């Protein structure tokens, strides 16, 4: 659910929690509240303000990913992705309006849609030979498969992702 942060910048209230490892990137809204409880509320607000400041400084319109590191000296911007981002792919199956539609709405001047999360989602990238998991994924009842149409699997190449959905309430 977006909230105004600075001029025309909207920042999502619920940030997904990300885990990196073994060339896999997971983005999950499951357990977000418990995981975020470990992060000081001031840091969350500082992160939102910093992301809004970056977007304002760039006069940016659209979806943007801003990756931050928590350091002893405070938050540090590590990466700016001025586009829809892998960390938001969970929104395809977890929100009323996903990051792709939000981006289009923003760049053509339409109001942002309802970004409220209706389901918990765990997103898993399919990297390289992970594409071989597709037959098993297709047997999963609550898995939504998103393939990128790449002809050849190579080590480290993103071939697609799967969103595993758990309906709320």
Where are the regions a protein language model picked out?
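Peripheral (often C-terminal) accessory segments that flank ATP-dependent C-N-forming ligase machineries
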Residues: 3, 9-14, 105-169
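Generic structural "secondary-structure junction" signal
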Residues: 26-28, 32, 37-42, 86, ...
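Internal nucleotide-binding/catalytic subdomain
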Residues: 1-63, 70
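Short, surface-exposed linear patches
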Residues: 18, 42-43, 91, 98-102, ...
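Active-site "cap" helix and flanking loop/linker of ATP-utilizing ligase/carboxylase catalytic domains
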Residues: 45-66, 71-72, 81-129
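Surface-exposed beta-strand edges and their flanking turn/coil or helix-capping segments
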Residues: 10, 32-36, 45-49, 90-95, ...
